[in-house]
């Protein structure tokens, strides 16, 4: 059977998939679209503002934290400097006495006569080598011992002649050496006095 091509085609029956929008409501739909676009633009502006506000607050918080940290660090440094200064002052005050006590303990283990001989011999060899004569003023109890120790100092071979004189005002640790150049106190007591004076001078000068 062949189709009848002489007849005009009949248009299909089209039905809407949903309800039709009346022409009177088209304005409402356009307004709704504009409102939606405006809402999206506002949302974008809010996000931009919020991001900028976050960055500002973050920077402010960092700056405040940095300033606070700097202030705290300055306070810590100031306290540390004060503590060091206080400890230094205490040390400067106690160090001389501590040194004296340590030396006294160490030297206390030696015989006073031996220390006196060493001090005198050191002075003669270092400062009076070449002098004609030196006279040692010592405690009477030390005369014989020093006479034996320096019996070889007879004025020959550039060694001064050593003469011993008793002096009851001196302790067994003391000795005053007289020479053509003047006199000088020797012995442990004199050295400890010189050490104390040296500490006192350094303390007064602020160098200790």
Curated annotation (Swiss-Prot):
Subcellular location field: Cytoplasm
Keywords: Cytoplasm, Nodulation, Plasmid, Protein transport, Transport
Keyword Transport: yes
Keyword Cytoplasm belongs to the record: yes
Entry-linked InterPro entries: T3SS_SctL/SctL2, T3SS_Stator/FliH, T3SS_stator_protein
Gene Ontology cellular component annotations, sorted alphabetically: cytosol
Listed Pfam families: T3SS_SCTL (PF06635)
GO biological process, one term: protein secretion by the type III secretion system
Chief location category: cytoplasm
Quaternary structure and interacting proteins, as annotated: The core secretion machinery of the T3SS is composed of approximately 20 different proteins, including cytoplasmic components, a base, an export apparatus and a needle. This subunit is part of the cytosolic complex.
Biological role stated in the UniProt entry: Component of the type III secretion system (T3SS), also called injectisome, which is used to inject bacterial effector proteins into eukaryotic host cells. Acts as a regulator of the HrcN/SctN ATPase activity.
Protein family per UniProt: Belongs to the SctL stator family.
NCBIfam families referenced in this protein's UniProt entry, alphabetically: HrpE_YscL_not
Name the record gives this protein: Type 3 secretion system stator protein
Species in which this protein is naturally found: Sinorhizobium fredii (strain NBRC 101917 / NGR234)
